[in-house]
From Swiss-Prot:
One of its GO terms (biological process) is sulfate assimilation. This is Sulfate adenylyltransferase subunit 2 1. GO terms for molecular function: ATP binding; sulfate adenylyltransferase (ATP) activity. PANTHER family: SULFATE ADENYLYLTRANSFERASE SUBUNIT 2 (PTHR43196:SF1). It catalyses: sulfate + ATP + H(+) = adenosine 5'-phosphosulfate + diphosphate.
Length: 304
């Protein structure tokens, strides 16, 4: 009698693939790090890393690039999760940008993103000498990410060249890098937004409350609902925050992240909403609407 193993579900296949990638990087590279942006994808990636090395801890730290403009709830959640899981958390901020007063309102989204995110990330990777950095990007998010490999190679200046990528056959990954070079690793490349939410529900993964619909103070700017998270946000003449039932599909710096009107206050509600939506989650990212500062150009300059 021949026993055949039970067929894995779609989510279990994705889980196994991601865990394999995480273990491969831990085995191949000398000094890896997991970028923790505090969003839903980071939450899933961290959960997978904990599974990959259970009952031990992952053999690499978490790192968050803090632009100083993240939602307050995100920072609180970040610190709570690091303490709960017993993970080492590195937090890096571009102090030169802080001293220059760089911000989304004073310098615009493109300048703010370059100085406080891209340059800050490159500073941190150089400071700690990381040769591999995990990120939670998925191919279904945005067109430039759709053509990026799981192992995304970067030169000594952290730049990505989309015309110079290595083939990835089956589940074989070439991790050879020269001195000064590094890779960005995307274990969730083949997941969709719906996969992420279904996995969060099935695995009971903690996420930032901002993903759930609630009454929040917002103003409408150029058709985008921006949450007034603190008193640094300048209001235009006659503008008053409105209390609306909103949630966020994606999270970043609060002045550059649009909310969506929603009644989805539970995970099943969010999943149902995802089954019906016809727009990308990154439609709420203000930085993606600037053609001169497209995602591909940002990645060429060192953005994740």
């Amino acid at each position: 009698m021949t026993l055949t193993p039970p067929k894995k579900t779609h989510l279990k296949q994705l889980e196994a693939e991601s865990i394999h990638i995480i273990r491969e990087v831990a085995a191949e590279f000398d000094n890896p790090v997991m970028l923790y942006s505090i969003g839903k994808d980071s939450a899933v990636m961290l959960h997978l890393a904990m599974k990959a090395f259970a009952p031990g801890k992952p053999p690499f730290p978490l790192m968050h690039v803090d632009t100083t403009w993240k939602f307050r709830e995100m920072i609180t959640f970040r610190d709570q999760m690091a303490e709960k899981l017993g993970m080492k958390l590195l937090v890096h901020t571009n102090q030169e940008g802080v001293e220059q007063g760089i911000g989304p309102f004073t310098h615009g989204s493109a300048k703010h993103t370059d100085v406080m995110k891209t340059q800050a990330l490159k500073q941190a990777l150089d400071k700690y000498g990381f040769d591999a950095a995990f990120g939670g990007a998925r191919r279904d998010e945005e067109k430039s990410r759709a053509k990026e490999r799981v192992y995304s190679f970067r030169d000594k200046f952290h730049r990505w060249d989309p015309k110079n990528q290595r083939p990835e056959l089956w589940n074989l990954y070439n991790g050879k890098v020269n001195k000064g070079e590094s890779i960005r690793v995307f274990p969730l490349s083949n997941w969709t937004e719906l996969d992420i939410w279904q996995y969060i529900y099935l695995e009971n993964i903690d996420i930032v409350p901002l993903y759930y619909a609630a009454e929040r103070p917002v103003v409408e700017r150029d058709g985008t609902l921006i949450m007034v998270d603190d008193d640094r946000m300048p209001l235009e003449p006659g503008e008053q925050p409105m209390m609306k039932m909103v949630r966020f599909r994606t999270l970043g710096c609060y002045p550059l992240t649009g909310a969506v009107e929603s009644e989805a206050a539970t995970l099943p509600d969010i999943i149902q909403e995802m089954l019906l939506t016809t727009t990308s989650e990154r439609q709420g990212r203000v930085i993606d609407h600037d053609g001169a500062a497209s995602m591909e150009q940002k990645k060429r300059e060192g953005y994740f």
